[in-house]
Amino acid sequence: AGLDLNLLVNKSGLEIREFLKRLYIDLWDIQYNIGKPTIASINGAARGGGMTLAISCDIIIASEKASFGYPEINLGLLPAIHFTHLPKIIGRYKAFDLLFSGRTFYSEEALLLGLISRKIPSPEINDKVTEIALNLSKKSPTSMNLGRAAFLRTNDLDYRRGVANAVEDFCNAATTPDAQEGLKAFLEKRKPIWET
């Protein structure tokens, strides 16, 4: 559903930065260079790192059982990677609401926001995703590769710069006492005690 938060507890900024570089930049590079459309199929919870993985795909299909969220802010962290793309997808004010409220939202709202491509009934989701993938696979591989690369270049011109800033912002937040307290409190299933 999301990132293993133990990976962030008691880590230095350098360790977190290297981890996030692999997670954000390397993931984007892999998705960008894969040469074929990628499809995220969500039939449960997608939070934090799960949202990062889903949003890196070209098409996002979700069932009515899908739920989404950016709970990092509840732990004293920042959902910084999503600052780069979410406002472009759903608009500044809606993005700010989702990113800074930490609230859970569901596939109906995600569809209305334009965050997912389609909402499919849960029992049909695997068949529908397979159908979409088969349809895409019947297209000219050269056209799909060139077209997808052009589409990504056009739509993600500032993505790398935004990701670099997001990694820095996340690291700055993740190493604060509040973030470490938020992470520990979550893992220990208690309310955080914030510094004031």
Regions found by a protein language model. Name each.
Residues 29-144, 176, 181, 190:
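Crotonase-fold acyl-CoA enzyme core
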Residues 184-196:
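Terminal low-complexity tails and localization/encapsulation signals of metabolic enzymes
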Residues 13, 17, 21, 122, ...:
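Short, structured helix-loop boundary elements
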Residues 3, 90, 111, 162-165:
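Alpha-helix N-cap/N′ positions at the starts of helices
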